[in-house]
Amino acid sequence: MVFRAGIGRIGLIRGLATQAAEVSATRYKSFKIYRWNPDTPAEKPRMQEYKVDLNKCGPMVLDALIKIKNEQDPTLTFRRSCREGICGSCAMNIGGRNTLACLCKIDQAENKDVKIYPLPHMYVVKDLVPDLTNFYKQYKSIQPYLQKASKPADGREHLQSIADRKKLDGLYECILCACCSTACPSYWWNNEQYLGPAVLMQAYRWMVDSRDGAGAGRREQLQNAMSVYRCHTIMNCTRTCPKGLNPGKAIAEIKKALAFA
């Protein structure tokens, strides 16, 4: 029995040594990244390849981008801030899907390239940085703040029941990363007039807030052919949302509110 136990320990040690050797070996992964520099407008956009050792890199795509920028190419440009899916800064198209680089895990298969582009159908500032000027202008247009004609008689904050507060769940969590809007074909075709899934979900968030007193005006603002009705329920918005929200459902609720107002 002692002999067998000894053999077991030797086997365990050999197994651990083998695992350590495997971990210490380099595992290079190819990242092909969209590059464009406005300072050299004559040069066309291109895909540039970088190799990253996965054994010396964090698990997320943003970790790889930061490693590339710090160690290989300081000219690589992208947005990032919180690194935990809260700010929405690092939204980009990874492997054909709009998502947040800080929440997107690196595929560990070394034979599969990771292709990274800026959010689609947006003007590009540089490399992976989209121009969100129009997106934020549209967000501003819905007046995303509490509007009340009068203050509470007792001077306190506007109270809200638990049931009314629950109506905001699945709406207020939006981080305005623009993943959903830039995945929407209707927004690609009409982004100057169609507000897009992200902005419309926020419009609905204020429409159903029991503390707000501008519901009629908010509905009237959306009562036209372009603001809401360009949504054709393709539902790319819901599929791509990195926060697991459902902009498509919010837009459907707006249409119902306008139809039965």
From Swiss-Prot:
Residues annotated as domain 2Fe-2S ferredoxin-type: 31-122
Subcellular location: Mitochondrion inner membrane
Residues annotated for [4Fe-4S] cluster binding in this entry: C174, C177, C180, C241
InterPro entries xref list: 2Fe-2S_ferredoxin-like_sf, 2Fe-2S_ferredoxin-type, 2Fe2S_fd_BS, 4Fe4S_Fe-S-bd, 4Fe4S_Fe_S_CS, Beta-grasp_dom_sf, Helical_ferredxn, SDH/FRD_Iron-Sulfur
Cofactor detail note: Binds 1 [2Fe-2S] cluster.
Residues holding [2Fe-2S] cluster: C82, C87, C90, C102
Pfam families in the record: Fer2_3, Fer4_17
One GO biological process term: mitochondrial electron transport, succinate to ubiquinone
Primary subcellular site in the record, as a coarse category: mitochondrion
Superkingdom of the organism of origin: Eukaryota
Keyword Cell membrane on entry: no
Keyword Iron attached: yes
Record membrane topology: Peripheral membrane protein
Catalytic activity: a quinone + succinate = fumarate + a quinol
Cofactor annotation: [2Fe-2S] cluster; [3Fe-4S] cluster; [4Fe-4S] cluster
Residues annotated as binding a ubiquinone: W189
Gene Ontology molecular function, alphabetical: 2 iron, 2 sulfur cluster binding; 3 iron, 4 sulfur cluster binding; 4 iron, 4 sulfur cluster binding; electron transfer activity; metal ion binding; succinate dehydrogenase (quinone) activity
Residues reported to bind [3Fe-4S] cluster: C184, C231, C237
4Fe-4S ferredoxin-type domain boundaries: 164-194
EC number of the protein: 1.3.5.1
Keywords, ordered alphabetically: 2Fe-2S, 3Fe-4S, 4Fe-4S, Electron transport, Iron, Iron-sulfur, Membrane, Metal-binding, Mitochondrion, Mitochondrion inner membrane, Oxidoreductase, Transit peptide, Transport, Tricarboxylic acid cycle
Enzyme class, first EC level, given as a word: oxidoreductase
Assembly: Component of complex II composed of four subunits: a flavoprotein (FP), an iron-sulfur protein (IP), and a cytochrome b composed of a large and a small subunit.
Family, as annotated: Belongs to the succinate dehydrogenase/fumarate reductase iron-sulfur protein family.
Function: Iron-sulfur protein (IP) subunit of succinate dehydrogenase (SDH) that is involved in complex II of the mitochondrial electron transport chain and is responsible for transferring electrons from succinate to ubiquinone (coenzyme Q).
Protein's name in the database: Succinate dehydrogenase [ubiquinone] iron-sulfur subunit, mitochondrial
Organism lineage string: Eukaryota, Fungi, Dikarya, Ascomycota, Saccharomycotina
Gene: SDH2
